[in-house]
UniProtKB/Swiss-Prot annotation:
Pathway: Porphyrin-containing compound metabolism; heme A biosynthesis; heme A from heme O: step 1/1. It is a multi-pass membrane protein. The chain crosses the membrane at residues 22-42, 107-127, 133-153, 172-192, 208-228, 269-289, 302-322, 324-344. This is Heme A synthase. The gene is ctaA. Keywords: Cell membrane, Heme biosynthesis, Iron, Membrane, Metal-binding, Oxidoreductase, Transmembrane, Transmembrane helix. One of its GO terms (molecular function) is metal ion binding. InterPro entries: COX15/CtaA_fam (IPR003780), HemeA_Synthase_type2 (IPR023754). Its EC number is 1.17.99.9. Its main location: membrane. The lineage of its organism: Bacteria, Pseudomonadati, Pseudomonadota, Alphaproteobacteria, Hyphomicrobiales.
Length: 358
């Protein structure tokens, strides 16, 4: 079996058609994943994540119907710590609001799983999948199913005998990162099916682009810890942190390493300064790509990513100064995903398209 680099002369019209159809399917999955994360962010910001205390993958699609079922669902919520300590005065009407956010988040998760699985079955049954991309495409629905399990594992941290009034920040961060890994994987696959007129960048540019993706992912993880600890509610000043560059109280927990994950002051401090680091690295990356691939699409993409990161930094500052209103919080989270998608697409484009197998 001969393997040749993909170009317009090697791909048959049928191969081109198949790749474009698979791309549409993958982009549909990607859009659904982005929507899920956005709704998940709203679920978190509105304190809705623990409103559904059971995991019913099939029957959970049907919401309560009638007053009796709603009362039954509300009674289940009243058994958890969040209700007992924070929401004792909550009415049924208020409960319905938080219920619908969590329900929408879960239903979207089921929908993207169905789209991924049914699409894979159809493309495989109609023999439209090339052998060299079959395994990666099989991994997509598996990753989505795993992410669904992680979502329930996260919710379980705040129900039952838990003393938490919200989900564990560790599990929240892990849940968001696994969602980002799905987004990275799908973006990488879909961009690999694109036909590029530009030749692949050199190995060093490809490596730098990959590291940029990793740094963006780390910053998103730190942002998830900030969200889980409500750390955006402290140090609502910029550029100084309540008048200091390095504020007091960063190492108040013992052992000291615990501050990295459980001290809201420390977590926000790290999130801020890692953002500065990412800003500098993205600038260096843009100029490095321009030097190694001058006036190329690789260079233009690198500067575009740098520009998007600037916008994201401004959004982060505004979100902090306004003490994380839901609107700005969601915009900031959404832009983080935009940065991630662009960084992954850029990285994949520096490598060229998937090879055509004859």
């Amino acid at each position: 079996m001969a393997v040749k680099r993909l170009n317009d002369n090697l791909l048959t019209p049928v191969q081109k058609r198949n790749r474009k159809q698979i791309q549409v399917w993958l982009y549909s999955i990607l859009l659904l994943c982005l929507a899920i994360v956005l709704v998940g962010g709203a679920t978190r910001l509105t304190g809705s994540g623990l409103s559904i205390t059971e995991w019913k993958p099939i029957h959970g699609v049907i919401p309560p119907i009638g007053v009796e079922q709603w009362q039954e669902e509300f009674l289940k919520y009243q058994q958890i710590t969040q209700y007992k300590l924070l929401n004792r005065d909550m009415t049924l009407s208020a409960f319905k609001v938080i219920f619908w956010w969590e329900w929408a988040h879960r239903v979207l998760g089921r929908l993207v799983g169905l789209v991924a699985l049914l699409g894979l079955i159809w493309f495989w049954a109609t023999k439209r999948i090339e052998k060299n991309i079959l395994f990666p495409l099989i991994v997509v629905p598996i990753l989505i199913a795993f992410q669904g399990f992680i979502g329930w594992w996260m919710v379980a941290s705040g129900i039952g005998q838990s003393n938490l009034t919200s989900v564990s920040q560790y599990r929240l961060a892990f849940h968001l990162i696994t969602a980002c890994l799905v987004i990275i994987f799908v973006t990488y696959l879909s961009r690999g099916l694109t036909e590029y007129s530009e030749k692949p960048a050199n190995q060093k540019v490809q490596c730098f682009a990959a590291w940029l993706v990793i740094l963006v992912l780390i910053e998103i993880y730190l942002g998830a810890l900030v969200a889980g600890l409500h750390a955006g509610k402290v140090y609502n000043t910029w550029p100084l942190m309540d008048g200091q560059i390095i504020p007091d109280g960063l190492l108040q927990h013992h052992p000291y390493w615990l501050n990295l994950f459980e001290n809201p002051l420390t977590v926000q401090f790290i999130h801020r300064f890692f953002a500065y680091f990412l800003f500098i690295v993205s600038a260096l990356h843009a100029f490095y790509v321009q030097k190694n691939a001058p006036h190329s699409t690789h260079s233009r993409r690198a500067f575009l990513i740098f520009f998007i990161i600037i916008i994201q930094a401004i959004l982060g500052i505004l979100t902090l100064l306004h003490e994380v209103p839901i609107s700005l919080g969601l915009i900031h989270q959404s832009m983080a995903l935009v940065v991630l998608c662009f960084a992954v697409a850029h990285w994949r484009a520096t490598k060229g398209a998937y090879r055509a197998v004859e």
